[in-house]
From Swiss-Prot:
The lineage of its organism: Eukaryota, Viridiplantae, Streptophyta, Embryophyta, Tracheophyta. This is Probable inositol transporter 2. Inhibited by nickel and to a lesser extent by cobalt. Expressed in the tapetum, but not in pollen grains. Detected in leaf vascular tissue and in roots. It comes from Arabidopsis thaliana. It is a multi-pass membrane protein.
């Protein structure tokens, strides 16, 4: 349980108040921004691998048409993040929030160096694991540190800056990817530059204090009070200190120890259990609605939609990353105005519609793929696709059939008179690719020419615009404020670990799913999961807008998990506002 100050009506002007308070007290903004670089690291790693993977496939032929190995390179960072998030929960409670961030920075920097120097895919995977460890720790620590070092009335807006820096990191990674497309060592630069923000945060965090609430919980009361006096105004700080003192003393009295966390009691505690249902559920659904298929594989999805070149795929993916960053800015404005719950519901409605569009577009693209021209294919008989030459009925072959050939892998060379006309199915290697390009034709290995490509980009854009302000940022905000102080580190670690496990499942299965059942059916699955997520939010997630953290705990204590579990204002808030 944690103390806080009641601020009636803060939700109506939170965005302006955030600017006003941070302008008057830039120290608060400095705390939020420095810790938020952890979000930048998170976002950069999510985005950079999507572009780097295009060039890793070109450099390592063992990776090029090996779907499992591509998924491994992407998902090993996620596997590392699972362990990192679990370790982060322990490190946050035992060593402190700041120490956990410093550990994350060191691991991320080490991983970036290993990846940049990797001579083979195996060492690249090792580097991805180290980066994942750092990202996992940072993902749950940064919003927690910001939340505990923020005045209650602008807590949502400041924690949203972490979400903005996540999406900003993704946008930056696409810019970096695009900048290094023509530079020797392309993907090595893309992955190695990731160490710079980690080093920057490491330096900045050495100049900042530990979380005041963690310090108070560990008995370092004078240090905590000194920090709170720098964060809160003179008229609010004494009340905040008293509330925090009362909450910590109550916890110690109830639990009998300020150090040892009893996991059985944690699971039995009504407030913790209900908080975990909401917090873990949001983190799981954040991944299962498919966001990181878009962020990890965005250029690949663009190529599946019919855009052939790596550079074009990266350039168009930059648009989705920009929309993602824009959506997080929207979240900062609305999070303390309309609330967490409404933002989630609006977000999921839009996600469902967008996934419906993507399902339809990719279905139409697959069923209208250009046919294979026997004349074009056999023009160079020595490079004709072997599976095509041995097929009983070549009239049934189209571009999609060609790309599924595997003995050996084959590619599609578009018609010289137009990409929608029948083209050639040839063996996929660099010399054949060059031959196709020398005839001013397009070479496809991951998707087919399509007149529906721009509609796919529209669907991706709408998906990002709706996802980012709600499901993109709100789960991290809710998890930073919904747990009692005593269990906040461990519960945050549990929720973040659930997020990364879900992330791993999605990242390791997306390309395999698209190969097995097609891109359209894969997006349909995400759409169905999004409907389930919407129902979950409506029933299980409380509204915590503008509420001090001790009041959130009391709300969880007295309400049952039913459809009307939340209200605009709790009774305690109304009573305290009336008596103020």
């Amino acid at each position: 349980m944690e103390g806080g100050i009641i601020h009636g009506g803060a939700d109506e002007s939170a965005f302006k108040e955030c600017f006003s308070l941070t302008w008057k007290n830039p120290y608060v903004l400095r705390l939020a921004f420095s810790a938020g670089i952890g979000g930048l690291l998170f976002g950069y790693d999510t985005g950079v691998i999507s572009g780097a993977l295009l060039y890793i496939r070109d450099d390592f032929k063992s990776v090029d048409r090996n779907t499992w190995l591509q998924e491994m390179i992407v998902s090993m960072a996620v596997a590392g993040a699972i362990v990192g998030a679990a370790i982060g929960g322990w490190a946050n409670d035992k060593l402190g929030r700041r120490s956990a961030i410093l550990m994350a920075d060191f691991l991320f920097l080490l991983g970036a160096i290993i990846m940049a120097a990797a001579p083979n895919p195996s060492l690249l995977v090792v580097g991805r694991v180290f980066v994942g460890l750092g990202v996992g720790m940072a993902s749950m620590t940064a919003p927690l540190y910001i939340s505990e070092a923020s005045p209650a009335k602008i807590r949502g807006a400041l924690v949203s800056t972490n979400g903005f820096l996540i999406t900003g990191g993704q946008f930056l990674s696409y810019l970096i990817n695009l900048a290094f497309t023509d530079v020797t060592g392309t993907w090595r630069w893309m992955l190695g530059i990731a160490g710079i923000p980690a080093l920057l945060q490491f330096v900045l965090m050495f100049t900042l204090p530990e979380s005041p609430r963690w310090l108070y919980r560990k008995g370092r009361e004078e240090e905590a009070k000194a920090i709170l006096r720098r964060i809160y105004s003179a008229e609010d700080v004494e009340q905040e200190i008293r509330a925090l003192k009362d909450s910590v003393e109550t916890e110690i009295l109830e639990e009998g120890s300020s150090e040892k966390i009893n996991m059985i009691k944690l699971c039995k505690a009504k407030t913790v259990r209900r908080g975990l249902i909401a917090g873990v559920g949001l983190q799981v659904f954040q991944q299962f609605v498919g966001i990181n298929t878009v962020m990890y594989y965005s250029p690949t999805i663009v190529q599946l939609a019919g855009f052939a070149s790596n550079r074009t795929a990266l350039l168009l993916s930059l648009v989705t990353a920009g929309l993602n960053a824009f959506g997080s800015i929207i979240s900062i404005y609305f999070i303390d105005r309309i609330g967490r719950k409404k933002l989630l519901i609006i977000s999921l409605f839009g996600v469902i519609i967008s996934l419906g569009i993507l399902t339809g577009v990719f279905y139409e693209a697959a069923t209208h793929a250009p046919a294979i021209s026997s004349l074009e294919t056999q023009r160079f008989n020595n490079i004709s696709c072997p599976d095509y030459k041995s097929a009983m009925n070549t009239n049934a072959w189209d571009c999609m059939t060609c790309l599924k050939a595997s003995s050996p892998s084959c590619g599609y060379c578009s018609s010289p008179i137009g990409k929608e006309h029948p083209g050639a199915c040839w063996i996929s290697d660099d010399s054949v690719k060059d031959l196709c390009h020398n005839e001013n034709r397009l070479w496809y290995t991951r998707g087919c020419p399509s007149n529906f490509g721009w509609f796919a980009l529209l669907g991706l854009g709408l998906y990002i615009i709706f996802f980012s302000p709600g499901m993109g940022t709100v789960p991290w905000i809710v998890n930073s404020e919904i747990y009692p102080l005593r269990f906040r580190g461990i519960c945050g670690g549990i929720a973040a670990t659930a997020n990364w496990i879900s992330n791993l499942i999605v990242a390791q299965s997306f390309l395999s799913l698209t190969e097995a059942i097609g891109t359209s059916w894969t997006f349909l699955i995400f759409g169905v999961i999004s409907v389930i997520a919407l129902l979950f939010v409506m029933v299980c997630v409380p509204e915590t807008k503008g509420m001090p953290m001790e009041e959130i705990e009391k709300m969880l204590e007295r309400r049952s998990m039913e459809f009307k579990f939340w209200k605009k204002k709790s009774k305690l808030v109304e009573k305290q506002n009336q008596s103020a």
